[in-house]
Amino acid sequence: MKQIQVNLGVRSYPIYIGQNLMSDGETLSRYLLKKRILIVTNETVAPLYLKQIQETMASFGEVESVILPDGEQFKDLAHLDTIFTALLQQNYGRDSVLVALGGGVIGDMTGFAAACYQRGIDFIQIPTTLLSQVDSSVGGKTAVNHPLGKNMIGAFYQPQIVLIDTLCLHTLPAREFAAGMAEVIKYGIMWDADFFQWLEDNVTTLKTLDAQALVYAISRCCEIKADVVSQDETEQGVRALLNLGHTFGHAIEAEMGYGNWLHGEAVSAGTVLAAQTAKALGLIDESIVCRIIQLLQAFDLPVSAPESMDFDSFIQHMRRDKKVLGGQIRLVLPTAIGRADVFSQVTESTLEQVIRCA
């Protein structure tokens, strides 16, 4: 079992990565003793793992569950209220703990519910998708979507522990695994050139779910994320680099309707647009763009935006992006494999040229 620490003073917490961790009551025990436990999961994950985690936690306290519909389109205030209703109807107090058992949608909603309920109760992340294991479960970003923008209503709120059981990936559909690889590749582009090279050399090994390769890839992503979050918890500086591909990607998700494009698929296409923007500005050359495209394609990810999206449909969403400051769109762009920076002087005419030529 691999352990990584997110260092945030009194809000520090461990990430555990390995196999069969959902049956490891000893690791969970210190976070559950004398607490009432409410597991939040969805209709896809519940038949696979809910009984197992309930049995693991039953010796520590009363365990109940809330099962939500599965999909990004349900990550909204209405379904968040389902969690609050369950907590209130069953008289959960401040000594309770919420457990997020699922992917990024479940993790984001459960974390936000924990941040809000009685002004804050404990929560535990047990991510079951590759995307949530390498990205959304770590760092304390919690939120729900709004029809006018993704993740626009939320809070920074850290979990007590992140428990990553890599065996969950064996029940993950191939499309979901590919979507998670978009975030894995992002870390190589924006932070670690050697890791990017390792990914290029291990495509087949990862796609066949080799246990050692999965633990290494997930661990490296979590190490990078933990390092970045420890430096900049609330995204005032370096943490913004983790948004590589996300400004374009969130525009795709919002325009196409949440759930039609998976988050990772939109990030993949958005990462290519970010690379093409960087090339248009003279920050990188064509060879780097090609390496990025080839690696994304190797994992069966989209490398272009939907044909139905034009510049106008992109820009209306990008102007509402959370990173906008003083009315200026701020983009994370690669400056090399393994390096990225935030740019706020990219003109809309440059963006139009890139989007029209993509």
Swiss-Prot record:
It catalyses: 7-phospho-2-dehydro-3-deoxy-D-arabino-heptonate = 3-dehydroquinate + phosphate. One of its GO terms (biological process) is chorismate biosynthetic process. Pathway: Metabolic intermediate biosynthesis; chorismate biosynthesis; chorismate from D-erythrose 4-phosphate and phosphoenolpyruvate: step 2/7. NAD(+) binds at residues 70-75, 104-108, 128-129, 141, 150, 168-171. It is an enzyme of class 4 (lyase). InterPro entries: Dehydroquinate_synthase (IPR050071), DHQ_synth_AroB (IPR016037), DHQ_synth_fam (IPR030963), DHQS/DOIS_N (IPR030960), DHQS_C (IPR056179). The keyword Cytoplasm applies. Its cofactor is Co(2+); Zn(2+); NAD(+). PANTHER family: 3-DEHYDROQUINATE SYNTHASE (PTHR43622), 3-DEHYDROQUINATE SYNTHASE, CHLOROPLASTIC (PTHR43622:SF7). This is 3-dehydroquinate synthase. The lineage of its organism: Bacteria, Pseudomonadati, Pseudomonadota, Gammaproteobacteria, Alteromonadales.
